Each structure stands twice: as C-alpha cells, then as structure tokens.
Amino acid sequence: MKWRLLRTGHKSGAWNMAVDEAIMVHVAKKAVPPTFRLYGWAPPALSLGRLQSFERDINPDGCRRLGVDVVRRPTGGRAVLHDNEVTYSFIISEDDPMLPSDLRDSFYLATEGIVKGLAFLGIEAEIRGRQGGGGSLADAYRSELRTRPGADGSVQSGACFDSPSWYEVVAADKKLVGSAQARLSGVFLQHGSILITMDTDKMCQVLKFEDPADRDRAQAQLLDKATSIEAILRRAVSFREVEEAVIAGVREHIKPIELVEGELLPEELSCAEDLMSQKYAADSWTKRR
C-alpha cells in the first residue's frame, strides 16, 4: 500500500486551504491515494475556525498593519497565526481500513508520526489526552469561545494555542502542535501547525480584545501554555530541517505503508484555483460569521 507525500512550499492562506479541500475532493473520487502534505505560508496568515466569528475575534486593522492575510479554514477550532511554522495536512477516505472510526483515535493516527518526527529533532513530545473530552465533530466546533475574563481572571481569546483539545501534542508541558479536523463527503481531513517560532505579541495584535489589559493577559497565557521548536532547542531551525524530520517520523509510523513523494494532479490544481477564487479568497466565506 502506498500513500502520497506532497511538499508544496510557501503559498497564500487562501491557496493553502483551497489545496487541502481540492485534495479531499479527489480522495473522495478515489482519484488519488491518502495524502500527507507539508506546506508554509507566504505572506503570514491568520486562519479562523470554520464556525468562528470574524467580527467578534479578529482585528482587521492589526492584520493589515502587520501584513497578515485572513482566511477561514474548513475545519473547526480557533484562530491560528501561521508564520514561521511547518503546516501539515493528512487526508484519507473514511472507508479506508487504516482510519479508525473514533475521532480521537483518528487524531492519533494523523499525529503520532509528527511526534516521532519531533524526536528526530531532539524534542521529547507526547500526545496528552484531555480528561472529559467528547468525541464528536460537534464538540470540536464548540471550541470557539467569546473573548472574556474567565472565573480565574484569565482571558479566553480567539487563539488556538491558548485553548485545550481532546488530545494535544505537548513538549516541556506546553502545546507545540495545534490541529483541527473535518469530515466532508466521506473524507477525513486533519491539518495543523508545528511552530518553529512563536510571536505572541503579533498573535495578540491580530486578534480583537475589549481592552489592552485583556490583550496583555492573553499574551501572558500564550507564553505560559504554548511553545515552539526553537524555544525548546535553543537554536535556529529551518523549515527544511523540520520538514525532513516530520517526513521521517511519518514514514516510520505508517510502516509497512510506503510514503511516496508526488505532485498535485492537474485536476487538483484546477479545482484548487476554483475553490480559491470562489471560496477561500472571498469575503463571503471569510467574513460569513
């Protein structure tokens, strides 16, 4: 059995999301095998969860000032600032015998290879379960919470990396990889961010807060709850180094399945172009909530 590996480089947020959905369309048609893709973002982009409120959570003036695009994902969860990171996506048919029916078990299938890849970099990471978490896709979509002071004085922001999920990839007791899932037309998608560096100030400038004090508290929470590869290793790390390590980890995890490097089909590229222009680059999608 063979799965496809794609390395598609640094592209715009609208293009990246369009490609993920285009691959889903063609996996549904059985035109392509299960696909593991690695990519980056140029320019940096803020991605919203599918059901997240643009008006409530996003600061468009801050995004424009910092040169940050805004795009809405097909997956749930909260906002992620995609800048210096390696992003992965894993796409497989729901009827594939390799895909568990349980949502949390499917997270493990898609993520354990990344944990192994981090080990090749010298990072001891683990998948840590959240107690009491539900297993339905609706539960994932309920994670978009209004920015407000919590009972303990904390701030619940629109940021992914200050919020819990059922299973998190953590290192040094902090969240290192943020992921989200979707199921569409019989196809499973999981994509996520592997942070090389983390700019909490920039993240908090592109999100909306009621006052500066809330922004300061949210930034402190991000520093407390999230980390990055360079923060752990205390050295400069390149996109390519992380990419190669993750590929090695995924290959080890899925043995005896072979991960074969390939390219997007012309039909996938055409589909992605249509999805980008009609959906992911359109305000009707990005600002629909």
Where are the regions a protein language model picked out?
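Catalytic beta-strand/loop module used to bind and position nucleotide/cofactor moieties
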Residues: M98-E252, D283, R289
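N-terminal catalytic or cofactor-binding beta/alpha core of small enzyme domains
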Residues: K29-K30, R73-P74, I92, S101-L103, ...
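Surface-exposed acidic/polar loop and edge beta-strand patches at domain peripheries
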Residues: L46-D61, V71, A79, E85-I92, ...
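Short connector loops at helix/strand junctions that flank enzyme active sites
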Residues: W41-P43, R65, L81-E85, P164, ...
